[in-house]
Amino acid sequence: MKQYDIGIDLGTTSIIIATEEQGVVFRQPTIGAVDTRSNTIIAVGDDALQMVGRAPAYIDLVRPLRDGVIQDHRMTNELIVRFVNEVCRSRIFKPRIAVCVPAQITGVEADAVVESVMGAGAKQVFLVDEPVAAALGAGLQIREPHGCMVVDIGGGSTDIAVISMGGRVKAASVPVAGNAFDRCIAQYVQEKFQIAIGPLTAEALKKQVACCTKSEFEGVMEVRGHSWETNLPARHVIYTRDLYEPVQELASRIAASARAVLESTPPELAADVSSSGVLLTGGGSLLRGLASYLAGELHVDVAIAPDPLNCVARGTAISLSEGRYLTAGFRDATPKAWHKCLQNNHDPFAGE
């Protein structure tokens, strides 16, 4: 019987599972609900997300990952076990599982991911550098001696890398991504209009109204929240121009990190990037005007990958068949092989 392989994008906002043959087969929010009276997990994924802003005081809503790193091991284990079992419930044999992790992850942080995935019943576990997975999922020919640059903007972090001959040459990770834009928008609305809005409303503003460039778009949305002046429900109309300042401030931090990576890239590879441009992946890449803003800051063409939300998950699944061609950015993390790797080098993705 054919070996069953799955790839997991263990994201701060969503967990996405894919196979090379079928593409994305499962997606759920990375969130769980705990009844603090009994310390039991009562809901995960979509069921827990519906409780945001509406749950009683004894229900604790937990987002177990922050900036792509596990913060709550118990909830992470629960999510992975439930979701993997959902995908593999009709399978007799244990799957091989590849999981993407941030480019700058430490050995200790990676070990926590390995432990959680092994707990879900994996036969073997492989870790994939997130920018490498994004490039594979976007269809880039990363095995060639040609430099390509990927900026993967997820929920918790933005991973940036220049890749050539199957591995990353230069990389950086910055804790500015989709969730940071949501928090920034909520804080700005509160300070400017004296209205407190919830995270779901802030996310809706980001998707429907926010833009990184002044002249590219003008949208409008009425928001409802809690007035800080009257302590009563309130509403206010928000325009794109109202959000330009906070959104561009965060976008400039992504641009600065991308510029630093590009400036430290060897000249020949930098010339390749100048010729082929930069590819954006991840849900954060869909922020209106971000691609054109980055193009102006980096002085190279910037494009959004087709189906950017699923590039990392799809590439993670593909890595299981392409792993032997990847010089760095792919590691057998099954405990015996993994501990040997960590003993030899603290960087989980350093070359042999």
List PLM regions with ranges.
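Nucleotide/phosphate-binding catalytic cleft detector across ATP-hydrolyzing
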Residues: M1-I153, A161-V278, S285-V312, A317-E352
